[in-house]
Every structure is written in C-alpha cells, then in structure tokens.
C-alpha cells in the first residue's frame, strides 16, 4: 500500500528537499496552498487538498483541511477493524505522515505596526487540528512540526520503511508542547487586549534558551528559558562577546544588576553586585568616575562580582576593571580598544553587550515566584515616586546636598534584600546591610561597612523602623539624614528621637520589601 504524507507549512526551509526524498521512497504527497505551489515549482508532484476533501479551499484559506477525509485518515486506528472498515465505507484514505507548522502568530504580533485584525488572521485553526489528530494517533502516524526533525524521519524511513514507535511518541510529545505554547501565546495576547489582569487560568510560554551545567548548586539540574515574547532590556536578550557560558547564579545576579541600573538612567552609573545584593553603586558625570565610585564603595565584596554599566565602556575604564576579578561585565557597548583590553587580559571574563533601555519597567510586567504546589504572581515594584510627594517629618529640613543623597539612597535601597539598610552620599553607596532578621542588625552592618566615611552620609531603610533604638545607632554613628517609608505605630517615637539628635528624616509612604 502506498504511503501518504500531508504537507502544509508556513516555514518552507528544507521542505522541498524533504519532499523530494519522500518521493524517492515512493510516498504520495498531499499539499495545500502555498506549500503546494512551492513543491510543484520544484518539480515535486503533489495532490491538492481539495482533491482529497472534494471541497475547494474557501474563505481566504480559513477552511481547507477541516474535513472528515483528512481527520478520518489521521485518526483511524490501524489495529481496529471497525475503524478501517469505516474508513473504507466512507472512501477515506489513510494518512501516515503529517508535516505541518503553523501560521506565524508570534512573528506577527511582534511587528511594531501590527493591527488587531492582522493578529486574528494569523491564528491557525486547521494546522493545530491536524497536528493534534496525528499526535493522538501516534501509534500509527508520524507527525513533524519542526524542520529539525526532517533528517531523523528520513533516516528511519530509508532504513526501515517506517519510523519507530519511540520516535513517533517523541514527536507527538513535541507537537503537544508546540500547540500548547501556540495557544498559550494567543491567550496571552487576547488577555492583554481586553485588559484582564487576573485571569482564572494562567499559562506561561517560554522557549529553551540554554541548557545549564547545573543550577544554584552542582547537585541541582537547571535550564534557562526565555519568554516567547522577549523583553528587550533583559539578560535573556544580551549578546555575549567573550567568556564561558553564563551559569545559573550568573544569570540571577546579572538580572538583579540590570534591574537596579534601570532606575539610574539620568547619569552615567555603575552597579556592582554579589549574591543578588548591590555591593557598590556609583554615579558621576562620566563612566570612568562612576566605576571608581562603585569600586570604592566596597573593594572587597566586588571581588568575583558582576558589574553593569549604562554607558559605553572606554579604554580608561576597561584598564581599571581588568585589574579586578569579575565574573561578568554588562554594558551597552564597548570601544574596540576597551574590548581588546578586557578580552586579552581576561580570557574567561564573561563580557555582555546589552543596549541600555532608559525606559522604566512596566508596572503590568509580572514577576513570578514558585512555591511548593503553586505560583505567586505580582506586578513589578516600579511605582512612580517623586520627592515632591515625600514628607519631612522632623523639625530640621534636609540640606540641598542631603536631599540629593536621600534621593540616591532611596533608589538604591529598593534592591537590597530585606531587612535592608543602605548608607550613601550623593554619588555612591558607602555601606549595605542586607537580609538581617532584625532591622537594627542591618543598621549596624551598613554603618560598620561605611566606617570612617560617614561624614555627610545619609541612611535609607526599605521599611519602617519598629523601635527608636535604631535612631540612636544612626545618630551615634554621625549620620544626620534618614529616609524611610514610615507607617509604624511608633513613628512619633522615632520622630521625637530624630529631633532630639538633630537629624532630618523623610517619609516616602512607599515600602520596598525584597525577599
């Protein structure tokens, strides 16, 4: 009995060669629309789909394969006489191989000028139906959705006259993943169109970007997936120019650093980060000086850390950076001389280019946190804040220099693990106190790190101070200005303590926990 294949593809890469090889093996080819034209033009004989269905393609191609002669040929079980008799009685010929890929919905909606009508028109209906029918009947039918699988199918057909059950099962699993992702992307698009922020069903679509050697620790398996609709300014979109593959921990740290620097868009800025916490942030009129400030913030912790810059790296900055052991450098671009300096002297240094996007993250861009048996979803902590909305709650007003430093500190504290405290001046961090289980311990940690650089320094807290003993520690260190959300039932005690020591204190009204 002659074997039959149905081919209908939007991605025509390799399809002519694949069909030619099938012809050599004696296969009969059914095809549709543009695929048939491409094969016919290449000299590959095909049968038109309407010759099989008895109906013409209609409604601008919306209806062409949704027919019992197609789906009966795909779904008939070869091991059931009743199925085979039904097919024979209804003059349905069996189809043994399906090669289909779908309308380019993703590519369509990524176009900057796409219209809603264009998006809707690129939702494939017949393609997923054929794929699912063939995949369901994988005991008898081979289904191919990815051109990368053409070779293995041809090899098995040439060697054995058929594909193995293991191959058919693997390809069926691939099809169900593919159609599920395709439908999820359509659902995501429509959900966004109607402004639904809390859908009752949540399906996320990601594509495998990089298999990883291991996860956070060597005993943990890991892989890196990228959003099907990529975010421009993200670690997943960065171009690697040098060094080994990024590790699991590299990617997490780099992501954290990129999130931080996105908030420092107005001036040349350098962020140094270690274990998801900033260990140095420097801001200046030029990127070399910003590097100096970031490095001087904590010359010890930066060792083995990640550095991200929001301006092009020049030779002078590269010379300074190459003298420090770093895991990763991320910048919008590098001069040729700077890149040569970094690559020649640091063969394993991971160097990434990521064009800086000064646009702030969208509040509607979700963050996902896995818990056992569930998933927490929240929008990003990108609430727009203005110093004009802040409240000075003490008798003493901040000086102009203190006000600038407080604004700098408030941007930085958002990215310190809670309980988080940070000490800064108006252009660099001086001490970071992250992740302590009581706030006064974080205060002491940040102050101890700042040491003899506290003259003119300010302090920021990611959440309110629960007790007035915190202000005593701060005042004792010589810090004269504090910024915090406020909101404690003991706020008045803290305000009175600040007044007692001659401090100025600002309440922002916004908390920035980070766990």
Curated annotation (Swiss-Prot):
Please provide the record's keywords in A-Z order. Answer: Hydrolase, Multifunctional enzyme, Purine biosynthesis, Transferase
Under the heading SUPFAM superfamilies, the entry gives: Cytidine deaminase-like, Methylglyoxal synthase-like
Picking any one GO biological process from the record gives: 'de novo' IMP biosynthetic process
Span of the signal peptide = none
Do you know which InterPro entries this protein is assigned to? AICAR_Tfase_dup_dom_sf, Cytidine_deaminase-like, MGS-like_dom, MGS-like_dom_sf, PurH-like
| Keyword hit for Transferase | yes
Q: Where is the MGS-like domain?
A: 1-145
Q: In which pathway does it act?
A: Purine metabolism; IMP biosynthesis via de novo pathway; 5-formamido-1-(5-phospho-D-ribosyl)imidazole-4-carboxamide from 5-amino-1-(5-phospho-D-ribosyl)imidazole-4-carboxamide (10-formyl THF route): step 1/1; Purine metabolism; IMP biosynthesis via de novo pathway; IMP from 5-formamido-1-(5-phospho-D-ribosyl)imidazole-4-carboxamide: step 1/1
Q: What is its EC number?
A: 2.1.2.3, 3.5.4.10
Q: Which reaction does this enzyme catalyse, per its entry?
A: (6R)-10-formyltetrahydrofolate + 5-amino-1-(5-phospho-beta-D-ribosyl)imidazole-4-carboxamide = 5-formamido-1-(5-phospho-D-ribosyl)imidazole-4-carboxamide + (6S)-5,6,7,8-tetrahydrofolate; IMP + H2O = 5-formamido-1-(5-phospho-D-ribosyl)imidazole-4-carboxamide
A Gene Ontology term for the protein's cellular component? cytosol
User: What is a GO molecular function of this protein?
Assistant: phosphoribosylaminoimidazolecarboxamide formyltransferase activity
What Pfam families does UniProt report for this protein, alphabetically?
AICARFT_IMPCHas, MGS
- Which family, according to the similarity comment? Belongs to the PurH family.
**Domain remarks:** The IMP cyclohydrolase activity resides in the N-terminal region.
This one is known as Bifunctional purine biosynthesis protein PurH
Which organism was this protein described from? Streptococcus pneumoniae (strain ATCC 700669 / Spain 23F-1)
Its taxonomic path starts at: Bacteria, Bacillati, Bacillota, Bacilli, Lactobacillales
Q: What gene codes for this chain? A: purH
């Amino acid at each position: 009995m002659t074997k039959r294949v149905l081919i209908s593809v939007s991605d025509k890469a390799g399809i002519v060669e694949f069909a030619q090889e099938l012809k050599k093996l004696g296969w009969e080819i059914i095809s549709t629309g543009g695929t048939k034209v491409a094969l016919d033009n290449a000299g590959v004989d095909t049968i038109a789909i309407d010759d099989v269905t008895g109906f013409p393609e209609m409604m601008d191609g919306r209806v062409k394969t949704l027919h019992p002669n197609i789906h009966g040929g795909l779904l008939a079980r070869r091991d059931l006489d009743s199925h085979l008799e039904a097919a024979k009685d209804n003059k349905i010929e069996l189809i043994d191989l399906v090669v289909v890929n779908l309308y380019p919905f993703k590519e369509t909606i990524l176009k900057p000028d796409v219209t809603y009508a264009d998006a809707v028109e690129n939702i494939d209906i017949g393609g997923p139906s054929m794929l699912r029918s063939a995949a369901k009947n994988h005991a008898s039918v081979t289904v191919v959705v990815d051109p990368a699988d053409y070779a293995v199918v041809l090899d098995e057909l040439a060697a054995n006259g058929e594909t193995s059950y293991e191959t058919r099962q693997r390809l069926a699993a691939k099809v169900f993943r593919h159609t599920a992702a395709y439908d999820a992307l359509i659902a995501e698009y429509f959900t966004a169109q109607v402004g639904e922020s809390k859908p009752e069903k949540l399906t996320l679509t990601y594509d495998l970007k990089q298999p990883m050697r291991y996860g956070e620790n060597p005993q943990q398996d890991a892989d890196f997936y990228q959003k099907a609709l990529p975010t421009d300014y993200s670690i997943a979109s960065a171009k690697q120019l040098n060094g080994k593959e990024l590790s699991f921990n590299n990617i997490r740290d780099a992501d954290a650093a990129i999130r931080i620097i996105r908030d420092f868009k107005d001036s040349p800025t350098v962020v140094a980060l270690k274990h998801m916490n900033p260990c140095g942030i420097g801001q200046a009129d030029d990127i070399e000086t910003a590097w100096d400030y970031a490095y001087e913030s904590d010359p010890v912790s930066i060792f083995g850390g990640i550095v991200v810059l929001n301006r092009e790296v020049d030779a002078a900055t590269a010379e300074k950076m190459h003298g420090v052991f770093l895991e990763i450098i991320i910048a919008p671009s590098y001069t040729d001389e700077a890149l040569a300096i970094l690559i020649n002297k640091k063969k394993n240094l991971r160097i990434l280019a990521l064009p800086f996007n000064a646009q702030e993250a969208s509040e509607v861009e979700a963050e996902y946190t896995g818990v056992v048996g569930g998933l927490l979803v929240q929008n990003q902590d990108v609430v727009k804040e203005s110093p004009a909305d802040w409240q000075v709650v003490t008798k003493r007003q901040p000086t102009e220099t203190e006000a600038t430093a407080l604004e700098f500190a408030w941007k930085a504290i958002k990215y310190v693990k809670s309980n988080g405290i940070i000490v800064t001046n108006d252009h660099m961090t001086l001490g970071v106190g992250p992740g302590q289980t009581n706030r006064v311990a974080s205060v002491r940690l940040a102050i101890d790190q700042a040491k003899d650089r506290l003259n003119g320094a300010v302090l920021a807290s990611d959440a309110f101070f629960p007790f007035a003993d915190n202000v005593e520690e701060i005042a004792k260190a010589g810090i004269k200005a504090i910024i915090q959300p406020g909101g404690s039932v003991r706020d008045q005690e803290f305000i009175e303590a600040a007044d007692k020591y001659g401090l100025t204190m600002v309440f922002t009204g916004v908390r920035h926990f980070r766990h």
